[in-house]
Swiss-Prot record:
PANTHER family: RIBOSOME MATURATION FACTOR RIMP. It comes from Granulibacter bethesdensis (strain ATCC BAA-1260 / CGDNIH1). Transmembrane segments: none annotated. Pfam families: DUF150_C (PF17384), RimP_N (PF02576). The keyword Iron does not apply. It comes from the Bacteria. Belongs to the RimP family. GO terms for biological process: ribosomal small subunit assembly; translation. This is Ribosome maturation factor RimP. Its main location: cytoplasm. SUPFAM superfamilies: YhbC-like, C-terminal domain, YhbC-like, N-terminal domain. Keywords: Cytoplasm, Ribosome biogenesis.
Length: 178
């Protein structure tokens, strides 16, 4: 799995990733949905790992939208959606698999994986350029070829919420009444 699946998504990713990097962001995923009036979905993270906000999404939208207009990548009318990767984010890069080791994920393969299966659920163990590793619920460890991953996404758990809050520096901070 990569940040882009189709040739069009790969072209868009290649165009916008350098500009996002200059702005301090990393591209997590590009998806193009629909045909008549496609929607280009851009998912991004801050390069430093901190959370992105609405203003960041707006800045990314303006920069990416202008570039896509100039390059005329999509000849028809299209929409643009920009978002953060979120807590239950997709795992599209090796660094995502490494960063979220110890958390639960669901994976769908585009090719049969170990045991002929296409769907897996388990604890992320990490990854390298060739394979992502999971410990399944029964304790079996599997190695899934990166180029065979169709979808991989973290599962929302209390542990993931706590880890994300801690990374954002908001863990254990008491709520103040307004």
């Amino acid at each position: 799995m990569s940040v882009a699946q189709t040739p069009l998504e790969q072209r868009i990713a290649g165009l916008i990733a350098p500009g996002l990097a200059d702005m301090g962001f990393e591209l997590v995923r590009v998806a193009v949905l629909g045909r008549e009036q496609p929607t280009v979905q851009i998912m991004a993270d801050r390069a430093d790992g901190s959370l992105i906000g609405i203003d960041d999404c707006e800045a990314i939208s303006h920069a990416a939208g202008a570039l896509l207009d100039v390059e005329d990548v999509i000849q028809s009318t299209w929409n643009l959606e920009v978002s953060s990767a979120g807590i239950d984010r997709p795992l599209t890069r090796v660094k995502d698999w490494v960063r979220f080791a110890g958390h639960l994920a669901k994976v769908e393969m585009s090719i049969p994986g170990p045991g002929g299966r296409r769907r897996f659920s388990g604890t992320v163990l990490g990854a390298d350029e060739t394979a992502a590793r999971l410990r399944l619920d029964d304790g079996e460890e599997v190695s899934l070829p990166m180029d065979g991953l169709k979808k991989a996404k973290l599962v929302l758990t209390d542990a993931l919420i706590d880890a994300t809050a801690q990374d954002a520096g908001v863990a254990d901070s008491p709520q103040q009444p307004n």
